[in-house]
Amino acid sequence: GTIEPEINPFAYCYLGTSLHKASPFSIIVRTEDADSRCYKGYMCVSSDFQYMPQELVWDMEEALNTVSKNPVSIHYCCVTNEVTKVYFEFPDHCVEIRNEKIHCGLQYQMSSIGNLSFMVQPYVEYANSRILVGKAFRLENRFSEMNFSERFLEIGQKAYGELKRIRKLFQEQVFKKLRQEVRYGKDILWKAMKEEGFKIGKKRAQQALDLCPDESPYIEFLLWIIQSCSMYTENFSEDISQKMELCMGNAWYHTLLDFDKYVEEIKLEKAKLKKENLK
């Protein structure tokens, strides 16, 4: 994880079993070490904020493991003067596009006292961008409530249901649409080649088809999708089609420009061979 540069990490601490107001000195993340008996701890670092007890982190991890086929892992953590964040990754919900992996999980956040003190929300990480998606589930910080841990785990379960919905949405609409558009674009390019009247072999045909944009140019489009508010509306399919047409239109326009250059190279090569044969 990361620790903000303005934080002075001069004190280590074993975290307690209950919620307490943070002490007026800096507490940093302590990882397990072969030469130490310290455990992982997550704590906010101001007298105005709350820390996240390590027992609660373990309880959350254990609870999430009961609903996941593969062990849940702590993908990342961040400690600042404003907030403490822990990101739980679900390996069975990660999606791969060629060599790129989309990480899916839940972000647990603790902040200042108030309505935003504790929040759980699904996140998606793709192309070095971590973005919160879907609904956020919040719990107000109330020290008098003895069942806080149970309530916090309960909203984690609700957030997990939201995460499953989002992943299903990705697979059924976004990735399906991407595959359809890639196939459609290759059909367009193949038709253009035939209309030019070039009788080229499979090798040259494949070289031309290799100019087609594959999934990799769609990072910008994917980021738009997962950030779009329309993702959670009934008009999502229409919105995604319009955005895809715009992105694909630009992509295929440049591809056909490249194809035109490729065609010109073939013409010059044929002319050169014809000239050499005449000699």
Regions inferred by a protein language model and the residue ranges of each:
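Feature for intrinsically disordered/low-complexity regulatory segments and propeptides
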Residues: 1-59
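Polar low-complexity intrinsically disordered regions
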Residues: 33-40, 60, 66, 264-279
